[in-house]
Every structure is written in structure tokens, then in C-alpha cells.
């Protein structure tokens, strides 16, 4: 669902505006306390051959499994790093995931990061006459997995027995915003 992907890219990757109960989004980590996206754009406006433009989402305190002060469970971000580089007038992103939900997270993350790259390139192009386009997206994951609760959905997706079953699966996926 492209509407979901656009919402995800804007809300969770580009702007960082999550739900009130969320302690962070990838975007909030990219934008605060240092606006890494803006600084990366400024770096490329000054020096297109800069190979040091890496945005880090993970924080040192993400090492804790629970907040030392509140004792609440803490889940570190799955996406840890977005490394960027301009080669042959194309912006390439290399992304590292600590953990990656192959069924629900992976499709939205890939599509969302493509839209992130398009917005990133657009902002650079608006400030320069480079005429960059998006390049390759490269993904690394330490642990890409499918949760047990998703097994039947994944089986149905890979081996649809009938059109009716496929339509039911599509409705289920749409309900999950996948």
C-alpha cells in the first residue's frame, strides 16, 4: 500500500513524529539532538566527494535492556546506521539493521528508505545544480527473521492455493498495513 509507505517514510524516517506512547522513531533519532539529515545535506552541498556522511540512529544507552532509572524494558532500534555516498551522480545508501522482521518490517523499510533517499536527493538538488538521482540501496542485517505468529501468513503468501485465499491474505496484509 503506497499510502502506508509514504506515511511511514514521512512520519518514521524523515520527520520523526511518532505516536505518543513511542519512545522514539528512526526520524526522531536522526533529527535530535543533532539534525543529522540536515547536516548530511549541508556536507554534500559543500563537498560531493565526502565519504564520511554516516547517520547513526543507535545511541550509547541502547546497550541497556531496561532503562536504569525507570526499570522499563528498552528495545533498541532495529535500523542502526544509514551510510551515504555520491558515486557517478547517484546517491547510494547502505543501511545496517541489527534485527529485521522479514515479513512486516522489511518491505516497509525498503520502500520507506527509497522515499527517504528521494527526499534527501531532492533537498541536495534544491541547494545545488548537481542533478543527483537515487542510486543503490544496500542492506545488511545481523538477524533477519520471520516470527512464528507469521508462519501461516508467509506460507499462504508463498503458496496461494486459490484466488479466494489470496484475496483473504491481501485483506489481512492490508489490515496490518503491510
Language model regions located:
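Terminal, non-catalytic protein-protein interaction segments that mediate quaternary/complex assembly
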Residues: 1-178
Amino acid at each position: 500500500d503506497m499510502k502506508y509507505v509514504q506515511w511511514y517514510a514521512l512520519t518514521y524516517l524523515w520527520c520523526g513524529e511518532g505516536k505518543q506512547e513511542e519512545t522514539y522513531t528512526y526520524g526522531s533519532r536522526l533529527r535530535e539532538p543533532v539534525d543529522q539529515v540536515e547536516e548530511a545535506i549541508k556536507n554534500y552541498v559543500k563537498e560531493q566527494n565526502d565519504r564520511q556522511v554516516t547517520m547513526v540512529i543507535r545511541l550509547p544507552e541502547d546497550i541497556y535492556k531496561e532503562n536504569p532509572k525507570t526499570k522499563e524494558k528498552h528495545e533498541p532500534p532495529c535500523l542502526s546506521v544509514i551510510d551515504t555516498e555520491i558515486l557517478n551522480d547517484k546517491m547510494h545508501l547502505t543501511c545496517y539493521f541489527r534485527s529485521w522482521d522479514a515479513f512486516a518490517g522489511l518491505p516497509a523499510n525498503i520502500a520507506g528508505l527509497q522515499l527517504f533517499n528521494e527526499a534527501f536527493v531532492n533537498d541536495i538538488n534544491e541547494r545545488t545544480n548537481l542533478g543527483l538521482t537515487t542510486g543503490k540501496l544496500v542492506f545488511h542485517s545481523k538477524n533477519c527473521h520471520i516470527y512464528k505468529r507469521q508462519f501461516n501468513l508467509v506460507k499462504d503468501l508463498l503458496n496461494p492455493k486459490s484466488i479466494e485465499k489470496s484475496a483473504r491474505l491481501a485483506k489481512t496484509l492490508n489490515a496490518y498495513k503491510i
